[in-house]
A protein has these predicted regions:
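Conserved donor-nucleotide/metal-binding helix-loop-beta segment in metal-dependent transferases, i.e.
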Residues: 112-149
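A conserved donor-nucleotide-binding helix/loop in the catalytic core
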Residues: 76-104, 110-119, 127, 167, ...
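N-terminal anchoring/stem segment of glycosyltransferases
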Residues: 19-98, 211, 242-246, 264-268
Length: 272
């Protein structure tokens, strides 16, 4: 009698763990406004603050093992450099390279004591911005007033949603998932601007709220707006030197900035 011996080979699959190190980027846009159709858009122009901002984030990136990139050439070329940041949604290759991208205005200062924002906010599902107390504490009845709802762009957004989500757009973190979720709304930037005559910050708030993307409120100290008034400078992680005073040579914060960042070359010319 023939006997058949069946040999069964057992393959043990051991999952390979890829040690993926998260790559995080800090990005700023500082482009010659004269390359755009509206160089005086929103009264924004070149100023000395950008050198301190750039230098502070270069040091911050080195300290925390991050990457820093400063964009100096137009891509979208729409109205003014402030609209260039929407390329972070429109160009998908950004997230072939990075897990998270933080946009910062060129008048935001990374304070020397600031911790690693990406370590504290590692969720890859959400769009993140600093809690802005002015909007969080605004009565619901005031959310849709003209000064916060220019030309009715937020008419379809509930007052509660506005109070929970609305943010100041000088600092935010974008991830691949949040960018993909928001993309159909971001693509409309020219049409929405044409319809409502809104600024880029209002448009971004609209895109976040209208899209329903997962939103994460970061601590308010990641974007502390300051026009030179006296505050406890040990509290802010990122100091946002907003407003027109920074265009004046006597702006009170320049003395402090020189102490915090003594290696900034004051002779470095500001582009016009």
């Amino acid at each position: 009698m023939l006997r058949y011996i069946i040999v069964i080979n057992y393959f043990i699959f051991v999952p390979v763990k890829y040690n993926h190190r998260m790559r995080n980027l800090i990005i700023q846009y500082y482009i010659d406004t004269n390359l755009y159709s509206q160089p005086n858009y929103n009264n924004l122009g070149p100023n000395d603050m950008e050198r301190y901002s750039r230098h502070s984030f270069e040091l911050y990136a080195q300290k925390h093992g991050l990457e820093f990139l400063r964009i100096t050439k137009p891509k979208l070329a729409y109205k003014h450099p402030t609209w260039e940041r929407f390329d972070l949604w429109l160009e998908p290759s950004w997230f072939d390279r990075y897990d998270q991208i933080m946009y910062v205005d060129s008048d935001v200062i990374a304070m020397p004591h600031a911790p690693n924002i990406f370590a504290k906010h590692a969720n890859l599902d959400s769009f993140k911005a600093a809690c802005y107390i002015r909007y969080r504490s605004m009565p619901l009845d005031d959310q849709h007033q003209k000064h916060t709802n220019p030309n009715g762009i937020f008419d379809a957004v509930s007052s509660e949603r506005m109070r929970q989500v609305r943010f100041q757009t000088g600092v935010f973190i974008l991830t691949k998932r949040s960018a993909e979720h928001m993309l159909p709304w971001i693509r409309q930037y020219r049409d929405v601007d044409k319809q409502y005559n809104c600024d880029d910050g209002t448009f971004l708030n609209w895109a976040v709220m209208a899209s329903g993307v997962a939103y994460e409120d970061m601590d308010k100290n990641w974007n502390v707006k300051n026009n030179g008034q006296s505050i406890n400078f040990a509290e802010p992680n990122f100091l946002h030197c907003a407003g027109g005073k920074k265009y004046k040579m006597g702006y009170g914060l320049y003395g402090r900035l020189d102490k915090w960042f003594p290696n900034v070359n004051s002779a470095d010319p500001v582009k016009s």
